[in-house]
């Protein structure tokens, strides 16, 4: 299991009241599977992505990335996990318009001086269609 989310809940405080952003979110993702998260603006998609990347913590529930509980990691270990295993491709307006789709996907690998950025980018673009 690459990703497993169990009963995830995220609440934020606003004055004297609590706002529930995510409630009882559960899913799992095996290697080679894809998952689309859709919904209107304000429905919690970005909050969910932040939790999955370890950028924020859930009110309750568990997230396992490669069978490692994000809840049990300190910030330094979450940062290492993000660096090694997590990446985002943002909506088109976040991409560099002067680069092709392939070049935009290659860019993070090139900035990190990784081997074979073109080959890796082509592989991932083929995986997502």
Regions found by a protein language model. Give the residues of each.
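Conserved ABC ATPase "signature" region
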Residues: 68-69, 116-129
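ABC ATPase NBD coupling module
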Residues: 70-87
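The feature captures the beta-strand-to-loop junction immediately N-terminal to the Walker
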Residues: 38-40
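Helix-to-loop junction immediately C-terminal to a conserved catalytic motif
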Residues: 53
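Short coil-to-helix segment of the ABC ATPase nucleotide-binding domain corresponding to the Q-loop/switch region
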Residues: 97-108
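Conserved ABC transporter NBD signature motif
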Residues: 61-69
